[in-house]
Amino acid sequence: MSRPVRAALLLVVFIAACGGSATAKDPLADRVEHLEEHGFEAREVEPRGDPLPEAMAVVQLDGAEATIYAFATGDEAQRAASAFAAEEQAAPERVRVQREGTNVYVGRAPAGDELPAVDFEDVVFTSEELH
């Protein structure tokens, strides 16, 4: 085996040992790309919140938006979904929360508007159909 081939092989083994591809470290990259392929305007944003998600993405809806929170564990996702549920109960026509595994989807419309529920469900379905 030549030296360049051996170096390339070692690099591949090293990358795999360090966690694999970039998308393995970014749990929403594939979902955002898939949503965009289906006509949604989606982008990743800086994660924030308590518990802190591993990644976050925002999807534009007709006069509203859906936020996808990707958590490391199901327990963190459940804790976040429970916290968002209070917001949903206070304004059920404006806010919708749905948990799928370690992901939490939150649809929000501005005050005085109504969340386009079908659009929100389309975001969840399109995002989840990959997995």
Residue ranges and their predicted role:
Residues 19-22:
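Bacterial signal peptide processing site
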Residues 62-78:
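A short acidic-to-branched-hydrophobic micro-motif
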Residues 89-131:
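A short, solvent-exposed beta-edge/loop patch
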Residues 15-17:
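C-terminal motif of bacterial Sec signal peptides marking the signal peptidase cleavage site
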Residues 36-49, 122-130:
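Short secondary-structure junctions
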Residues 1-8:
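Bacterial N-terminal signal peptides that target proteins for export
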Residues 48-53, 78-96:
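An anionic, turn-rich surface loop/hairpin at beta-sheet edges
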Residues 46-65:
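Secretory pathway targeting signatures of secreted, lumenal, and periplasmic proteins
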